[in-house]
């Protein structure tokens, strides 16, 4: 029995990771574009901080609501079709945003952007699950997650350069058209695992060490019964803390540096990139550490859980001093370490699914967990906008963010103690 990927599998692993890496970068450039143009758009169109907070939030509401059914839909129709359609839809919405001026129309475009991007992270989890052995999924999952934060690091200097050269509207259109082109390439080149005739050695490599799982499609009854499991609720509520902090910094960091720290637009682009580079590093480090400790004999589920809890705690600890320091250097350093820690935790949260959930439920549980994260992410921008309008400061907003992360670490610690069980197998045992 072979425990190594064949040359053909390695080729498909490379194709899959390359697509997800590029799509992840475009995905988060789309999300970051509004936060980068935050001050420019609010001045040009006359929007308040609360209105901008709402614009930044509605993306997450559309995204979060689609997370609940997206896993079941992807399991029924396949990753290739659903992700390809989502990539095309979100890129079209991004392109159209560059043509709009009405607050209402911008709200609608942002909601559609969120709906289109809904399959992205569940697709990453499913693709890694399909093409990698369970003992080797930490690093590829880290790379998939890293693409998003790498884009967040690229976004400030790249998007500000585009905005200064062509204006904010053309910036939106350029990024949107790039995504439309990638969606066409995805449809042409990507293949679902079921579309290939794998050899026995390839199947042995892919399935070795994985928990047994039924190959039947997930029914609505089985999907609904997942919510009876305590660990799933821990994942949903706990991931709120990850989503809240990620989205506070993603949506408001450029405005924070401009308004609270007095940086110019050009300088903001480069300084804002630093914390997101640390976030990308946190994802990559987590992937390496997760694979290392498992290969050294650590329990796959418990090790991920501890990394989540510690990551959330350190993220809270670094965010608090950023709220009170008078030094711009110290604030950026603390925020950088907070983003390193929160993305270290977030990557472990996705890795937790890969080692604690039966294969056929991977996309369903991924979507449900992501729903939790984006509920937190939905409220972070609007709550921050309201706090800024009321206090004319980011201090309270950062304190709230740190508190949410701390509480999320407690939820993971006390609630996530058992693997997710397959409802089909539970029914068989009770008969």
Where are these regions (language model features)?
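Cytoplasmic helix-loop-helix junction between adjacent transmembrane helices
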Residues: 109-149
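A late C-terminal transmembrane helix in Major Facilitator Superfamily
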Residues: 354-391
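Extracytoplasmic gate region of multi-pass secondary transporters
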Residues: 34-35, 227-286, 343-350, 354, ...
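Helix-breaking motifs and short loop linkers at transmembrane-helix boundaries and internal kinks
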Residues: 46, 78, 99-105, 116, ...
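C-terminal ends and interior cores of transmembrane alpha-helices
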Residues: 88-101, 310-326
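Extracytoplasmic
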Residues: 15-49, 120, 249-254
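Helix-loop-helix hairpin linking two adjacent transmembrane segments in secondary transporters
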Residues: 144-195
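Conserved MFS/SLC helix-loop-helix module at the cytosolic interface between two early adjacent transmembrane helices
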Residues: 65-104
